[in-house]
Amino acid sequence: EENLRVSVRDYGRGIPQGKLVEAVSVLNTGGKYDSKAFKKSVGLNGVGVKAVNALSSRFEVRSYRDGKVRIATFSKGNLLTDETLDTEEESGTYIFFEPDATLFLNYSFRPEFIETMLRNYTYLNTGLAIIYNGQRILSRNGLVDLLNDNMTATGLYPIIHLKGEDIEIAFTPVSYTHLRAHETLSD
């Protein structure tokens, strides 16, 4: 069923084609380990994609780079096919998966949870645009947008926003509000 499958396409550099199969199937490979990349990375150095691969009845990864696309397909983490073709598509990565129904009985995806998580990525990566089911998710102001989107009461003062190369802080005092259903009180 179409609602039980996921596909993701980005337009970054693409996973290096020589390491594509290992990057999605072998632990401790494919991560962004240098300090500059790690500051901006939101994830666990590829552990998640390897787990998704192992727990999927169908998993496909494509890396588009330099006029070539390398396509690898898997089932339950086992490599089924691996080929490289010419392409005119933009650089980037495509991943498709269908969770293994023998492991995940009667599973379903929760669109509101997925949208919230994707929105959180945009707060942490200002300017990143994500298209989810035809809806564009974008944060131009990072943590300021996070506060504005989640506060149920007006702050006592304008949001204070500090952003440096390695840190971003946004805060404002409020008298009484709920933030993501958690009640907060002040004296």
Please provide the spans of the model-predicted regions.
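N-terminal, positively charged regions that mediate nucleic acid binding
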Residues: E1
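Short beta-strand elements
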Residues: I167-Y176
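Single conserved hydrophobic/aromatic residue that forms the stacking wall/gate
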Residues: H178-A181, L185-D187
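A short catalytic or substrate-binding loop motif that flags glycine-/basic-rich loops and adjacent residues
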Residues: H161-K163
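Intrinsic-disorder/low-complexity loop/linker signature
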Residues: G134, E165-D166
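ATPase catalytic-site recognition across NTP-hydrolyzing enzymes
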Residues: V21-S25
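GHKL-type ATPase core
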Residues: L4-G14, G18-K19, G30-A153
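Conserved, well-structured core domains of diverse proteins
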Residues: Y157-P158
